[in-house]
């Protein structure tokens, strides 16, 4: 389940051998990003490359709304969002996942309204949450 990937990864990272880690990466097709759009830590120690460019060209939804950005692609959900399974479920139900095209609108109450292209309904997020969701223009 998408909402529990972060918790499981945190458990496994402390008990998995390097050999098992390499095999899992191979079985998964050598991914470089988590399902939340963040680089998988430690890949450079397994022969992969470090993903330092994941911050390039992205801005939080809070900053995007304040700067007048009205659309963008959801790129990543940072750790404060990943540790809340209920929030992750709500975001996934609304289509707020990496790769989704979003319309962004600031709300007067400090919330950010997000509508995913092709979805009937959007979701309003408080700035405390929206600041941990990143988009690329």
Q: Model regions: which residues?
A:
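Amphipathic alpha-helical interface segments
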Residues: 127-137
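Conserved segment of winged-helix/HTH DNA-binding domains
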Residues: 1-4
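Mid-protein regulatory/catalytic core that forms ligand/cofactor-binding pockets
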Residues: 11-129
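Amphipathic alpha-helical segments within well-ordered protein domains
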Residues: 6-10
């Amino acid at each position: 389940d998408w909402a529990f990937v972060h918790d499981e990864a945190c458990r496994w990272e402390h008990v998995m051998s390097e050999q098992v880690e390499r095999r899992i990466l191979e079985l998964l097709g050598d991914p470089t990003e988590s399902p939340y759009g963040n680089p998988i830590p430690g890949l450079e120690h397994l022969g992969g490359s470090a993903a330092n460019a994941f911050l390039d060209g992205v801005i939080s939804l809070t900053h995007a709304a304040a700067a007048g950005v009205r659309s963008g692609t959801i790129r990543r959900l940072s750790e404060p969002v990943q540790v809340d399974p209920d929030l992750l479920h709500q975001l996934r139900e609304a289509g707020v996942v990496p790769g989704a095209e979003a319309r962004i609108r600031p709300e007067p109450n400090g919330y950010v309204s997000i509508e995913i292209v092709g979805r009937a309904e959007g979701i309003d997020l408080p700035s405390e949450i929206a600041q941990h969701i990143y988009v690329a223009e």
